[in-house]
Regions:
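One-carbon transfer enzymes
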Residues: 1-226
């Protein structure tokens, strides 16, 4: 049963796997802090729209096709957010820069430690490649061995500036499968291939932590109203 909560919106640009985690949790009724949830897609026909339908989440397309359209996109986004009294925005695979909106908390999920592997240009496979490159350097310097344990992180944080450096809502370590490290170190797979495997592995943890981070962020908003 849903209690009085806030209105939230998820912004996605692609397949929406992270968005699906939040929408699925909302559908089964465990997102108690949310009174309403909407999906905002930046692309017509994006896979996230079908996932919204499957979860019975209302959706809208506010299209943005090129960097020069970003200012107008943000103007239209702000108008939609205000018209629907959205107080929390979850960035879940949005490829465009989102401008701050007054009285709206924005959160993002990052597949690593935001301080070491965050900032502008650090997204997608680039993050995992950097994590793995640093691990290879540690092995090269004989500080650790390929068979040792290594970890990365999943971080849910508030959106702010500098990029990816907003207050952390939750952060958790994720153990990197040993076979990825060993295969990369032996040259069996390339850095790109290793990063793709690590990305797939970490994604499953993102699906756990993004709904939890969304609830924590919504609770923060509700607590301020008391």
């Amino acid at each position: 049963m849903k209690i009085a909560g806030i209105n939230a919106g998820i912004i996605a640009s692609g397949g929406g796997t992270d968005a699906n985690a939040v929408m699925s949790a909302y559908k089964i009724g465990v997102m108690h802090e949310l009174a309403d949830l909407k999906l905002i897609s930046t692309k017509i026909g994006a896979g996230c729209l079908e996932k919204a339908d499957n979860n019975k989440v209302k959706h809208v397309v506010i299209e943005c096709k090129a960097k020069q359209e970003v200012p107008d996109f943000n103007r239209r986004l702000r108008q939609y957010v205000k018209e629907n009294n959205i107080q929390l925005i979850i960035l879940a695979g949005c490829v465009w820069e989102i401008y701050p909106i007054e009285e709206v908390l924005m959160i993002n999920i990052h597949p690593a430690d935001t301080l070491k592997y965050g900032g502008r240009h650090m997204y997608g496979l680039k993050v995992h490649e950097r994590v793995l490159s640093d691990i290879m350097d540690v092995i090269y310097r004989e500080i650790k061995k390929p068979e040792d344990d290594f970890e990365t992180y999943v971080t849910v944080h508030e959106v702010g500036f500098p990029i990816d450096q907003g207050p952390v809502i939750m952060r958790a370590p994720v153990k990197i499968p040993g076979e990825i490290i060993k295969a990369l170190n032996s040259g069996t797979i390339s850095l790109k291939e290793a990063a793709e495997r690590l990305q797939k592995h970490v994604l499953e943890y993102e699906w756990i932590f993004l709904p939890a981070g969304t609830r924590a962020a919504a609770r923060k908003i509700l607590d301020k109203k008391k």
